[in-house]
């Protein structure tokens, strides 16, 4: 049996970021649930201004998004989050995962309210989503998106968190059963 992955986790608060609404041990549990290999990760909580700047500078989208994942190669150079050699089969990379995960708390809070979800549930989903991206998971096409969403849902279930892709209970009847798209990365 394989031993649990080793995790070096750094938590940062960016300028204009509200305090993180959950404890460090709780964040660590979410990360470890999604982690398949040893990792050195930083989770940086940012405000809207920094979130917008990063999304614009690195993705060409001029708005703050909920979560961004920046993967790094062993030599410290930035590469795509999936540059660790994950195969299409989803096999985990052999070397440690090194990444920064940026969470824009004002966006996460706004989305949680709009979706009528507890903030900590939505945050757990996005942290897990970012960790999966750091390991090479993508949602660029329907097959990849379904695989990633299925894994996210299973991981969240361990924490008694409902499927994030199902509509809120008060959604109109014509939306029941419809899945929403994966969050931005």
Segments the model singles out, each with a brief description of its role:
Residues 1-123, 132-185:
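An acidic/histidine-cluster motif and surrounding catalytic segment
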Residues 126:
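Residues within the DNA-recognition helix of helix-turn-helix
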